[in-house]
């Protein structure tokens, strides 16, 4: 599905990504863990074309490095940034409809699915998105991206700053997404969530991957957790 090889990226003269390799297969949830500032968010931005990438990025066998972000989206890559990119003045339903218009007009994920999974969005479908709680806005952002029918969705820190109940709902949503046949590349800070829902995990440090394995592999590797994850 997604194959990234020797990915480099810069902010000015700062060398942020220093040879990142990662793979996401069909129907997989793959999480990227690591401390703040190691390049996890930049990895997603480089794949999406928001940061100029150097290296090889293949999506479904096609090179996408150097394409514009809207071109990459049209090929089937969805992206949910960390800042909960909603249209606050529009209603919940209008936000979801924008996702439909931007997508490929298929039925793998519908507005009805969003409302069924998150009844609070149904209850507040006529409310301005800007008045939703942080957890509700995150749910809306993910659901709106799904309306474009991506084959792969990249999600940056979806549980950041959310209450425990909202975190659980987001975890349930991610599992449901994968069950629908959509691959997920997840940047996540909460180790317990990543271990629970991921098929594979990467740990990132100093702009490169320092671990690639299964949840059981990471649980067994105390040195990686101590060196690269624990504060």
Task: State where each predicted segment sits.
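Glycine-rich phosphate-binding loops of nucleotide-dependent enzymes
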Residues: 1-231
């Amino acid at each position: 599905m997604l194959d990234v090889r020797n990915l480099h990226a810069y902010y000015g003269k700062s060398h942020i990504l220093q040879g990142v390799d990662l793979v996401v297969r069909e129907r997989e949830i793959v999480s990227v863990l690591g401390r703040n500032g190691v390049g996890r968010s930049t990895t997603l931005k480089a794949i999406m074309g928001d940061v100029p990438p150097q290296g090889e990025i293949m999506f479904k066998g096609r090179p996408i490095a150097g394409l514009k972000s809207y071109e990459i989206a049209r090929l089937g890559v969805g992206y949910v940034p960390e800042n909960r990119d909603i249209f606050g003045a529009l209603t919940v339903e209008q936000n979801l409809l924008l996702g439909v218009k931007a997508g490929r007009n298929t039925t793998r994920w519908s507005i009805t699915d969003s409302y069924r999974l998150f009844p609070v969005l149904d209850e507040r479908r006529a409310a301005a998105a800007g008045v939703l709680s942080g957890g509700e806005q995150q749910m809306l952002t993910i659901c709106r991206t799904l309306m474009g029918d991506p084959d792969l969705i990249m999600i940056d820190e979806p549980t950041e700053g959310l209450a425990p109940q909202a975190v659980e709902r987001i975890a349930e949503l991610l599992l449901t997404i994968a069950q629908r046949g959509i691959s997920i590349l997840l940047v996540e800070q909460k180790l317990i969530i990543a271990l629970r829902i991921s098929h594979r995990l990467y740990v990132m440090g100093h702009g490169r991957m320092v671990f690639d394995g299964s949840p059981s592999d990471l649980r067994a590797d105390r040195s990686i957790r101590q060196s690269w994850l624990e504060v």
